[in-house]
Amino acid sequence: MAKAAMLKIKLLSTADTGYFYVTKKNARTKTEKLSFKKYDPVVRKHVEFKETKIK
């Protein structure tokens, strides 16, 4: 069986609220860690979300 190209990752808020998004990325083409500015409803602002592993 072939190795899956798409990995599930967790985007964790840098505002230390514990809020996160779950998304997928192609591990073969995107080798660097993802970083997005997304909405954090806990602080009610757009903040940076960085990639972490799902435990």
UniProtKB/Swiss-Prot annotation:
SUPFAM superfamilies: Zn-binding ribosomal proteins. It comes from the Bacteria. Keywords: Ribonucleoprotein, Ribosomal protein. PROSITE patterns: RIBOSOMAL_L33 (PS00582). GO terms for biological process: translation. The keyword Repressor does not apply. The keyword Kinase does not apply. GO terms for molecular function: structural constituent of ribosome. GO terms for cellular component: cytosolic large ribosomal subunit. It holds the Pfam family Ribosomal_L33. Belongs to the bacterial ribosomal protein bL33 family. PANTHER family: 54S RIBOSOMAL PROTEIN L39, MITOCHONDRIAL, LARGE RIBOSOMAL SUBUNIT PROTEIN BL33M. HAMAP family: Ribosomal_bL33 (MF_00294). This is Large ribosomal subunit protein bL33. The gene is rpmG.
